[in-house]
A protein has these predicted regions:
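RNase H-like, Mg2+-dependent phosphodiesterase core
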Residues: 1-185
């Protein structure tokens, strides 16, 4: 049997991230959450998301009753799984790095989009399951619109947030506020 493991949201600007574990043969699918707090300042610098990923993968494999003697894991190539790889090697777990596509990828990206829409309130029609620059700017613009209330959702441990994007977000927020005031007068 084969278990696929993938992530979503680990490189996105805001919100929680998610790990998905999927047993192909039975269709069993489970999710685990990496809190946005893990991606802030010291937690990020101390690689807390990578440590938590190991814990969550272990927990997910237990729930799926994983048997290392007759199952293989197809593991997403993402950096979030770097310490998971070490764990698999130490435990003699048979795994392959792979590009995860199909049902699991769709499900775990869907979990992220649901979180962004339903938990955080991102309403843009431009928000899709496809990661990349377009999604970054949808999320960035959402933060800018109400910066001081939404900054708490930012993965502020990311270096570029503190060296580039935070200042740009404040600047954009201030421009929007001035524009709103002009419209009222």
């Amino acid at each position: 049997m084969t278990i696929e493991i993938d992530d979503s949201g680990t490189g996105d600007l805001i919100g929680n991230a998610f790990l998905g574990l999927f047993r192909r043969e039975t269709g069993e699918l489970i999710f685990r959450t990496l809190s946005v707090e893990l991606f802030k300042e010291e937690n990020w610098q101390n690689k807390k998301p990578l440590e938590k990923a190991v814990e969550l993968v272990k927990d997910g494999l237990r729930e799926l009753n994983f048997n290392k003697d007759n199952e293989i894991i197809k593991l997403c190539r993402g950096n979030i799984f770097d310490q998971v790889r070490f764990y698999f090697i130490e435990e003699g777990i048979n795994y392959e790095d792979t590009i995860v596509e199909g049902k699991l990828q769709d499900a775990v990206e869907g979990k992220l989009i649901n979180h962004l829409r339903n938990d955080l309130g991102v309403r843009s029609k431009q928000l899709t399951k496809k990661s990349g620059a377009k999604r970054f700017f949808v999320l960035f613009n959402w933060v800018c619109y109400d910066f001081y209330n939404r900054e708490k959702y930012v993965k502020s441990g990311f270096k570029k947030w503190n060296t580039v994007w935070r200042d740009r977000a404040i600047e954009k927020y201030n421009k929007m506020q001035k524009s709103k005031k002009k419209k009222r007068t």
